[in-house]
Amino acid sequence: MTQISERLLVQAHLDAKQPNPLTAEQEAEYRAAIAAELKAQNAVLVAHYYCDPVIQALAEETGGCVSDSLEMARFGKNHPAETVIVAGVRFMGETAKILTPEKRVLMPTLEATCSLDLGCPVEEFSAFCDQHPERTVVVYANTSAAVKARADWVVTSSCALEIVESLMDNGETIIWGPDQHLGRYIQKQTGADMLLWDGACIVHEEFKSRQLADMKALYPDAAILVHPESPEAVIELADAVGSTSQLIKAAQTLPNKTFIVATDRGIFYKMQQLCPDKEFVEAPTAGNGAACRSCAHCPWMAMNTLERVLDCLRKGGDEIFVDPALVPKAIKPLNRMLDFTQAARLKLSGNA
């Protein structure tokens, strides 16, 4: 990690702290005020699984959406609301704006970014792509609008395997960016010819196989759930590997009563909601930076607070804008992803 991104991480972590935690009464007041503003402004709140539980609960109770980044994009595009509040990180807000440029897209804070986005500047990535013009460019959704505009395909972790497999079946070779661990996992699963960008998620990269094996010894009957942004040695210990939505599904379907979960702890809200009779344990990390990386929670996701949600609704200042010149280029790979996954859904339902 560069010194610049490390400093940004520290600042994000500090900004996320709430010096005066809300009382139950204050929290209820914020939730009521936000619900009223959403209704008055014909707005909808979409939240990622990694947001704090109170934000996820608020999205659910106000008719919004709690999901992975793929379903967030689909929900925001299809919902009739004039304004979409995206509780997540900046690339999610940009994606919503690209798909529905006619809508107003707000975020609780525009400072909520992503280490994968920061680690893939468009100038450097474009130069890398230009060196291999014969390859199909596939980028993870955790990238800027400018990087998406340079890509042929955008994927999320829930559909990346299937899309890469389809491209491989067509004889295409691939440039993959920016998450090296997810790229390596896909490469290993599919056998695709892929050149990998050297990026990583600051949360998932902190999971360590030795500590995970030690924890497994403490919980011998537990199943290990791992997000594929984790290092290869961690993935090798998993009983199930997948996106956030896929890990939640695994928690529901596997017979185990205890799960060791190697992803952001924000996902525990939905897992515990759907599986109240099961126990979920945070996988150990080994963070040693200036910020609190030893606890598995994205500091930028933590910046989505009730106060900021209400503030962005009342002031409208944290609005997402995307360069109009980028939108026609960026929407093509995004729509390819949405069309591909929709076709896969229809095929699956037809075979049911």
Curated annotation (Swiss-Prot):
Primary localization: cytoplasm
Residues involved in iminosuccinate binding: 48, 69, 140-142, 157, 227-229, 244
Enzyme Commission number, as recorded: 2.5.1.72
Cofactor(s) listed: [4Fe-4S] cluster
Keywords: 4Fe-4S, Cytoplasm, Iron, Iron-sulfur, Metal-binding, Pyridine nucleotide biosynthesis, Transferase
Organism: Pseudomonas putida (strain GB-1)
One Gene Ontology biological process: 'de novo' NAD biosynthetic process from L-aspartate
Chain residues that bind [4Fe-4S] cluster: 114, 201, 298
Functional note: Catalyzes the condensation of iminoaspartate with dihydroxyacetone phosphate to form quinolinate.
Protein's UniProt keywords contain Ribonucleoprotein: no
Keyword field contains Amino-acid biosynthesis: no
Record's protein name: Quinolinate synthase
Cofactor: binding comment: Binds 1 [4Fe-4S] cluster per subunit.
One family name in Pfam for this protein: NadA
Catalytic activity: iminosuccinate + dihydroxyacetone phosphate = quinolinate + phosphate + 2 H2O + H(+)
Pathway field: Cofactor biosynthesis; NAD(+) biosynthesis; quinolinate from iminoaspartate: step 1/1
GO molecular function: 4 iron, 4 sulfur cluster binding; metal ion binding; quinolinate synthetase A activity
Location(s) in or outside the cell: Cytoplasm
Family recorded in the similarity comment: Belongs to the quinolinate synthase family. Type 1 subfamily.
UniProt superkingdom: Bacteria
GO annotations of cellular component type: cytosol
SUPFAM superfamilies hit by this protein: NadA-like (SSF142754)
